[in-house]
Amino acid sequence: MKGLLFIVSLLCLTLHQRVWAYQVIGMKSDVICADIRFTVHCICNELGLFPTSRLSKPCPWPNRGRRSADDEDYLFEEDEDDEFFHPRALSPPAAKSGDERLEDEVSFHSRSKRDIAFHEECCNIRTEHKCNKTTVELYCRRYTR
């Protein structure tokens, strides 16, 4: 009976912790695979969990139009521009109004400027990093173009 209670408690704790699997469409594999920590820092910054952190360089995803996880054809399109963009410029409306702190209920897919797609395919790299209470699972995918 104690074993069952332990397993149920462990399962509840595991399900309570939010897990985000990230892969940004159009991300160049050499950029994301070469500097996993920096990419995770970018993700945490975009989530608003490190609102005062300064990034040493631009985050490795380009500024493009609206993105959606439902657009599978978009995975194979060429990048139209090579400009890099700081994620703070992509803040959701709550952050644009001056409130830098994002609420947990704010969905990542409610972005008006662009959406980030989430996929699990990777280049044999799976890292987990703690972003405050959120575990970031970063999957790095190698693109063949």
Curated annotation (Swiss-Prot):
InterPro entries: AGH. Residues 1-21 form the signal peptide. Keywords: Cleavage on pair of basic residues, Developmental protein, Differentiation, Disulfide bond, Glycoprotein, Hormone, Secreted, Sexual differentiation, Signal, Spermatogenesis. It holds the Pfam family AGH. It is found in: Secreted. The keyword Glycoprotein applies. The keyword Disulfide bond applies. Disulfide bonds join 33-122, 42-59, 44-140, 123-131. Androgenic gland. One of its GO terms (molecular function) is hormone activity. GO terms for biological process: cell differentiation; sex differentiation; spermatogenesis. Glycans are attached at residue 132. It comes from the Eukaryota. Residues 68-112 form a propeptide. GO terms for cellular component: extracellular region. Controls sex differentiation and the formation of male appendages, spermatogenesis, pigmentation, and male specific behavior. This is Androgenic gland hormone.
